[in-house]
Amino acid sequence: MTVRRDHMMKKNAKLWLVVVVGAAALVLSACKAKSPAPPSGQSSGAGSFAAEEGRENTGSTTNPPEAAQAPEAAQAAEGQAAKSRLRPRLEDDYYEYVNWDILSETRIPGDSSSWSYLYQLDQDAYATLDQLLKETVKKRPSLEMGSTEQKIADFYRTALDEEARAAAGLGGLAPYLESVRSAATIPQYLESLAGLRRDLGLASLINVQKTEDLRDSSQYVYYFFQPDLGPGKEILEDGTMGSFLDEYQSYIGRVMEYSGMEPGDAGKAASEILAFQRELAAATLPLSRRQDPDVYYNPYTAAQLQQLLSNVDVPAYLDALGIAGRDFYVVTDVKALEACNDWLTEDHLELLKNYTVFSLLSDMSLYLTPQMQGNALAWHNFQNGIAEMKAADKLAGEMTQSMFGFEFGRLYAEQSFSEEDKENVTAMIRQILAAYKKRILALDWMGDETKANAVKKLDSMTLKVGYPDHFTDIHAAARITPPEEGGTLIGNVLALMRAETAFDLEEGKKPVDKEKWAMTPQTVNAYYNPSGNEIVFPAGILQEPFYSPEADLATDMGGIGMVIAHEISHAFDSSGAMYDEKGNYKMWWTEEDLENFRALAGKVADYYDGQEGFEGRFVNGEQTLGENIADLGSLSCITSIVGDDTDGLRALFTRFATIWASKYTDEAMIRRLNTDVHSPAKVRVNAVLCNTDAFYLAYPQLREGDKMYLAPEQRVGIW
């Protein structure tokens, strides 16, 4: 899983919604992390084992879109229908064969869009930390003001206080909203955008975030990413999503009403905002191309930016952001930024202001009045086919755990991961690295010079297991006000966002901290960071069924071994392979070997293009290429460790299929096919097994005509 560093997503508020919607990057989308990538799904080459898929948000709502109905009855009927069918032969559907019982008996929780072992582990981590949270709240009278425990307890208490949220209205967000609405000129509008980014880290039209420089990973650089496209380019341009976009327009209208607009004006604004996002989407790169550093790494000096953004006073804007004076900046999507510039004219000012008001309130609605929060959560539930609203205390708990992720992560690591576990997993990583090195040296399509460089990259790889050695308090400057002193949820959220953004701005002036983690210890995922040439395995994923110190080698190889090898493979996928052993985007291939690699990658993309993901909708082979290369490479590597032990191979394949057992609502599946860089779980099992030679050794009964059989000359793979 590459944990694609979601700098391409908006920070803070939207990031929390992403986290609660899924903490399992390993499974569906994140395998690489921390390389400059564009927001909202733009990838830099970082890879994660899975896509986000843990906690989901729900809440009360006013006039929400209809959610899925009668989940228990529908799922019960589905379960009975499944049981009435026969378990498929392993020769025809290995994923269903192994997971038949669990998939027949397990129901998607009513307040979630999915169930999986990743989801279950995420819920287990939440429960562990929720107990600590409740104990902290009980101790509140004795806690010292300004301590981490006080901040956590009082944040949670304000998150639960509906009356205070209702009374606060927009709270401290109101001045930012007024700054946007009162802008009488484009320069004044841009000044309001700069204030939102500088103070809170929020962006709408011009999205600037810092991350490592691709060509010098020891330094930070500021990247101009794509603008806020709501549900994203892929959905905005999907001709089958008409009814979905109708609901999205209704959601925009409700947000604009909550901003103070009359219903008729809000409806008109909603129509214009959606049309505007579609116009912007037409100018932006598709997800499949946002993973190519050659495409998204475009350095511009401030003077060159001025030519690109002719309707912006670039020096003044950079100064207002606090990032003036850099040698260069990086534009990830030149045509998208050109399109933004074209819209920055006085005749579009009202549209631009409405667009930013919507973007701001959509980001922040979770922390505002019960009605606004309910509207946001109801829209989220509609998008993902979630039938039930989440209990208020669980919602507040998830919000608190997410906002204080590393603070809770330190406590989780202390309780749930031992030094012995860390040593065991580290030893397994080294064993897999050795096997990977052996496989690279045996490749017949790669020359000696490139092999030597690949081995150097493996030997230089940094291993991070369980939890960071040091925890940095990025919220040290934040004052969390207790309810008794008039503290409100929105006020405390803004305090945290200001502290994080100020910390981020100061961090950008220093060399990159190579000890920093992009995931909290409790996250149920893993990632490869190409800019650090590092593989990272949080304690949250180092639990059963992925890892057990009591399991035999083959079984653990099929679980955590597959995760480890997957992340290592990201160092050599279609994007990660372009980074050297120091994490710099630098060519270390011979021309001939690179041509061979790209030819093999093309075959992988073509193969996955033919894989059905869900009811006539197919996997996008280019969009998922990096993750598919990592899946194929990981299984080839770990099976080489088990060798020709057929019993061991069967145990490995069984555990491999087991860890991917999952169920999704129809809506969630469709969205994932559009917006995820990972293939669906069933494809990740069956398609990979069909292309793995050891699978045929373990199950010699496989024959031509079986659905799990693929002739040797048709099998694809690289590593």
Predicted regions and their residues:
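Bacterial N-terminal signal peptides that target proteins for export
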Residues: 7-17
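Noncatalytic, helix-rich "gating/capping" subdomain that lines the substrate-entry/channel surface
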Residues: 134-427, 431
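Second-shell loop/turn segments in exported
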Residues: 80-84, 115-116, 179-180, 232-241, ...
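Short, low-complexity, disordered segments immediately C-terminal to signal peptides
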Residues: 32-64
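Sec-exported extracytoplasmic/periplasmic mature domains
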Residues: 95-103, 130, 134-138, 161, ...
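Zinc-dependent metallohydrolase catalytic domains
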Residues: 150, 188, 194-198, 426-561, ...
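Active-site-surrounding "flap" and adjacent substrate/cofactor-binding loops of secreted or lumenal enzymes
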Residues: 89-93, 97-160
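C-terminal motif of bacterial Sec signal peptides marking the signal peptidase cleavage site
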Residues: 27-30
